[in-house]
């Protein structure tokens, strides 16, 4: 269970929460321009755009959860259990394994328009990374500063949706998530007027009553509505610090606390990490469940012409600033 969002001020910001009951040793990974990408069916890409994001590195391969490239295109895969459907290879298609999809797009595409063109030819296959690592059931959000789409590989084929809110969670399929927003069209950040009856003197006895009815539970549909409302109504100064701070506030609205979402006896889904990438500057910010201080990695401070992955372990401990 996860939530992804976009935000734009002077720069463009993209990030997500990773909500799960256990970690797989995620790291902040930079894939430099000359790191060789060997695809199962699509040959080798020796030189490509540099990419930064969160990944689990296995056999020197970055299994990205979310990432952005040096051109400002960003992408994340979110759980889509029960609805995702991957196929065997299809003649005449670009047969890309599920775990290769993020590198396939971000290594070659500078914007969403180019990604759309590449996706027209794609078949996302069920080829596993290894027998011990089955293909994740995912759908994807792809965004730049001007456009945002959602890609779903389902039984009917590849579906590409425009995403005007710049938010994605999990089930149900994206078109159903968007339709659900119609049920909340009356919500507002402003105080409500009395439309119940002009014969009753009803008053707004508390601030925030314009958003009464905004879902507060942790289900994916409710998180979509809540994140969309918060994102669409967010306001901040346009500078970097204010924008990054506001982005984390947006995703903190769907934060999951240990104990509130039990997935098995004694096991709870939590927000393992929250990310925010300034895709214009190539700076990847993040927090973790036990590390609320914002940490950052700047891809442009590394040798982007290298052929080796660069990885930074996530800071997972709390850092408390004592003032006396």
PLM regions with names:
Residues 1-13, 118, 127-130, 135-136, ...:
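C-terminus-biased signal that marks the final domain/tail of proteins
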Residues 92-128, 240-248:
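Proteins synthesized as precursors that undergo proteolytic processing into mature forms
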Residues 20-22, 81-83, 156-159, 166, ...:
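Short, surface-exposed beta-strand-loop junctions and turns on beta-sheet-rich folds
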Residues 135-159:
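Long, compositionally biased
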Residues 75-77, 160, 284-286:
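Short hydrophobic/aromatic-rich beta-strand segments that constitute the beta-sheet cores
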Residues 1-94, 126, 311-315, 319-324:
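A contiguous strand-loop segment
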Residues 28, 68, 149-153, 275:
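Broad, structure-driven detector of short, well-ordered beta-strand segments within folded domains
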């Amino acid at each position: 269970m996860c939530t992804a969002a976009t935000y734009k001020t002077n720069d463009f910001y993209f990030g997500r929460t990773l909500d799960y009951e256990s970690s797989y040793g995620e790291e902040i990974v930079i894939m430099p321009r000359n790191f060789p990408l060997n695809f199962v069916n699509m040959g080798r890409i020796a030189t490509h755009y540099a990419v930064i994001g969160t990944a689990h590195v296995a056999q020197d391969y970055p299994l990205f959860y979310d990432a952005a490239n040096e051109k400002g295109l960003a992408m994340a895969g979110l759980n889509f259990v029960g609805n995702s459907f991957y196929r065997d290879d299809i003649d005449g298609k670009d047969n890309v394994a599920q775990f290769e999809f993020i590198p396939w797009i971000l290594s070659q595409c500078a914007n969403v328009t180019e990604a759309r063109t590449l996706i027209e030819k794609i078949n996302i296959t069920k080829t596993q990374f290894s027998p011990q690592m089955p293909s994740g059931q995912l759908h994807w959000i792809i965004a730049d500063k001007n456009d945002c789409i959602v890609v779903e590989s389902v039984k009917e084929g590849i579906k590409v949706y425009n995403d005007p809110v710049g938010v994605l969670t999990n089930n149900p399929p994206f078109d159903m998530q968007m339709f659900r927003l119609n049920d909340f069209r009356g919500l507002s950040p402003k105080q409500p007027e009395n439309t119940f009856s002009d014969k009753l003197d009803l008053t707004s006895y508390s601030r925030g009553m314009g958003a009464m009815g905004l879902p507060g539970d942790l289900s994916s549909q409710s998180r979509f509505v809540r994140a969309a409302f918060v994102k669409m109504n967010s306001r901040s100064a346009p500078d970097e610090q204010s924008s990054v701070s506001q982005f984390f506030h947006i995703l903190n609205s769907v934060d999951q606390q240990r104990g509130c979402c039990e997935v098995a006896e004694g096991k709870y889904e939590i927000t393992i990490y929250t990310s925010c990438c300034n895709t214009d500057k190539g700076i990847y910010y993040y927090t973790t469940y036990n590390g609320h201080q914002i940490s950052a990695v700047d891809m442009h401070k590394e040798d982007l012409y290298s052929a080796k992955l660069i990885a930074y372990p996530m800071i997972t401990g709390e850092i408390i600033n004592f003032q006396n």
